[in-house]
Structures are given as structure tokens and as C-alpha cells.
UniProtKB/Swiss-Prot annotation:
Keyword Flavoprotein: yes
Species whose genome carries this gene: Synechococcus sp. (strain JA-2-3B'a(2-13)) (Cyanobacteria bacterium Yellowstone B-Prime)
Swiss-Prot/TrEMBL catalytic activity: 5-O-(1-carboxyvinyl)-3-phosphoshikimate = chorismate + phosphate
Binding positions for NADP(+) per the UniProt entry: R49
Gene that produces this protein: aroC
Protein name: Chorismate synthase
Length: 378
């Protein structure tokens, strides 16, 4: 865990591989046994994040076909580590020769060199978004566990590209609406404007950033482990570990700071199924614990660092120079970041679901009388 390549407590994932190495992949440890699982379950999610899927993504062509090497037998998980491998087939390390000695502005080149004294400059190595293949593969397993165990649905979409903002109701948006266009924005009018902006940036050799919003529905109450492992804290860490992420907010987020307590509080009311909240400014989490309402969060992604426009930079030996980067890169990471965000949210929720049942769901203590609060004295 100290090396930063593993994530999770009970549902633990470890990713490996580099952008232009032989393969990338993941080992998932802690998956419950007897879960029906096939390569097709994982492939469906990998296809959503693979490169070359549309004119507004990187032109790199990778099939990203997954292989399950262990942990599954006759279509069911064994409860042992699951190893998933994806081979790289369209690597072009020669496109990155200049990066061997020149740092890309706002990229991990300089900081990896400063930390390790060595780096894989071919496509960014571990700093490449290609590392997220392992996350998405593991997220596919987590999604299936959540769906079968609790009916949880996780759905992300592009909410903003640069200054083009979509109008989306997270409580009613559907997967069909998200996947209806190449930018993965469920607002058709905004999607058309976003695509135009991305195409313009690509023609100019530049890039754009924006915001991905994610909703998790039917999350059981009680997930989260205060005080240091609050659910929103782990969600923030998860999505902020994604490449190019620069901001996180949940529920009302920063906008909530403009409200009073009376305006912001989510009032309770009773239904036949128990208590609910009339609003959801808490974003489905109170006190670090899920409250049963939709979990709604947003992640800000910066513009892609590697661009064809000339930029001032320095070399490995300290010389100032100008770099116009080559290689194949997304002019905007957001369309492919959608399944990445979903995967990281799924990993957190699955881990906390298992942790909750381990702590609170295994022992029956109904025979033990609970203390009753004494009535106040008159």
C-alpha cells in the first residue's frame, strides 16, 4: 500500500503496467465467491473507455481485449485473487523520443523524474490514462456486486466542457441518454456545442477541460466509516486519483456556502418505507455515512497537458527550450473519463458495502437489551 498502486480495504485492487509497455492490468483481491462473472462483463466497460472510439478522442487504436487469468472457474468467482490482463497493441514509443529529455508543461514528467530519478517517458508510463484500464476492469466487478447485492446503479456523464454547461437532472437521467452521443452528455443541445468546442480545440492543437457528474442510486443506508474513512472522503480520494482530475464536490458543494443553515438543511419526512429527505443538498451522505438518498458528486478535469501548440519548458539538464508535443492524445479527457469515474465510485461503494456487513451485518445481537434514554425530569 505504501507504493500507491493499491486501493481499497476489503475489496482491494492493484493496477500495473505502462502506456507503451507490453500490457496493463489489475489484480482484484477480496471479491466474494460465487459471483457470476465473465470476460464479457468486463469488456463492456472497457469498450466505453478504450481509445479511438470517436473523432473527439485519441486516435490510438486499441482493442483492449481483456483476459481473466485467475480467480474465476466455470463462470463464477472463487473468492481468490482475480487477475485481468489487457495487452497493448498500438504503442508508438518513437513518438515520444523528445520527451526523454524535455518536460511537458503541467504533465507528470518533471515530478516523476524528481521523485524517482528515472521515468518511462514513452507515453507517460504509469502517469498515462492507460493505467485506468485496470480500474475500469475492477470497477466492472464492483458494479456487478453492488447491483446484485443491493440494486445500486452508478451513472456518470459529462456535465460541462469549458464554458458549455448541460442541464441535467441527476435523479432521472438514464444510461441511454448518456450514451446517445460521443461526448456522453445527456443534454442533446449542450452535447452538440461541446463536440464543436472539442473539435475546434483539436484542430488548433489545443485541449479542453470540464466537469463529470456522477449519481449513485439505491445506495443502502449505513455505508461509511467515520471518522477518517467517511464515505465522501474515500470518494474524493478515489476520483481525485484519476489522471487530470483537479477538483471534487458532493451535494451542494461549494454553492452550498452561499446558503444559510435553514436554506441548506435537508428536512426529514416519513414515508411507508421509512424516513426520507425532501431535498438532497447533502448529496446522499450525512456524517460520513450514506443516508439512502442518491449520492451525487462532481469531478473537475483539467485540459489535457500534452498539446501540439508550442510551449516554453526546460530539459532534463536544465536548458530552457520550446516543445510542440507529438503523439496521440485526447483533446478532451471527459468523454472517456465517464466510465473511469463510475469505476472509482463503484470501487468505493463496494468496499464500504463489504466493510459495513463485516462490522454490522454478521452478528445478531437482538437479545442484548439496548439502553433506553431516561425521561427528562420535570
Amino acid at each position: 500500500m505504501a507504493n500507491g498502486n493499491s486501493f481499497g480495504v476489503l475489496f482491494c485492487v492493484t493496477t500495473y503496467g505502462e502506456s507503451h509497455g507490453g500490457a496493463v492490468g489489475v489484480v482484484v483481491d477480496g471479491c466474494p465467491p460465487r459471483l457470476p462473472l465473465s470476460e464479457a462483463d468486463i469488456q463492456a466497460e472497457l469498450d466505453r473507455r478504450r481509445p479511438g472510439q470517436s473523432p473527439i478522442t485519441t486516435p490510438r487504436q486499441e482493442a483492449d481485449r481483456c483476459q481473466i487469468l485467475s480467480g474465476v472457474f466455470q463462470g463464477f468467482t472463487l473468492g481468490t485473487p482475480i487477475h485481468i490482463l489487457v495487452r497493448n497493441q498500438d504503442a508508438r514509443p518513437q513518438d515520444y523520443q523528445e520527451m526523454a529529455t524535455t518536460f511537458r508543461p503541467s504533465h507528470a514528467d518533471a515530478t516523476y523524474q524528481a521523485k524517482y530519478g528515472i521515468r518511462n517517458w514513452q507515453g507517460g508510463g504509469r502517469a498515462s490514462a492507460r493505467e485506468t484500464i485496470g480500474r475500469v476492469a475492477a470497477g466492472a466487478i464492483a458494479k456487478k456486486i453492488l447491483r446484485l447485492a443491493a440494486g445500486v446503479e452508478i451513472l456518470a456523464y459529462v456535465q460541462r466542457v469549458k464554458d458549455v454547461e448541460a442541464q441535467v437532472d441527476p435523479s432521472s437521467v438514464t444510461a441511454e441518454q448518456v450514451e446517445a452521443n460521443i461526448v456522453r452528455c445527456p443534454d442533446p443541445q449542450a452535447a452538440a456545442a461541446m463536440i464543436q468546442k472539442i473539435e475546434e480545440a483539436a484542430r488548433e492543437g489545443d485541449s479542453l477541460g470540464g466537469v463529470v457528474e456522477c449519481v449513485a442510486r439505491r445506495v443502502p443506508r449505513g455505508l461509511g466509516s467515520p471518522v477518517f474513512d467517511k464515505l465522501e472522503a474515500d470518494l474524493a480520494k478515489a476520483v481525485m486519483s484519476l489522471p487530470a482530475s483537479k477538483g471534487f464536490e458532493i451535494g451542494s458543494g461549494f454553492a452550498g456556502t452561499y446558503l444559510t443553515g435553514k436554506q441548506h438543511n435537508d428536512e426529514f419526512y416519513m414515508t411507508p418505507g421509512g424516513w426520507r429527505t425532501r431535498s438532497n443538498r447533502s448529496g446522499g451522505i450525512q456524517g460520513g455515512i450514506s443516508n439512502g438518498e442518491d449520492i451525487v458528486l462532481r469531478v473537475a478535469f483539467k485540459p489535457t497537458a500534452t498539446i501540439r501548440q508550442p510551449q516554453n519548458t526546460v530539459t532534463l539538464n536544465g536548458q530552457e527550450t520550446v516543445l510542440a508535443a507529438r503523439g496521440r492524445h485526447d483533446p478532451c479527457v471527459l468523454p472517456r473519463a465517464v466510465p473511469m469515474v463510475e469505476a472509482m465510485v463503484a470501487l468505493v461503494l463496494c468496499d464500504h458495502l463489504l466493510r459495513h456487513h463485516a462490522q454490522c451485518g454478521s452478528l445478531v445481537l437482538s437479545e442484548v437489551p439496548l439502553p433506553v434514554a431516561a425521561a427528562p425530569q420535570a
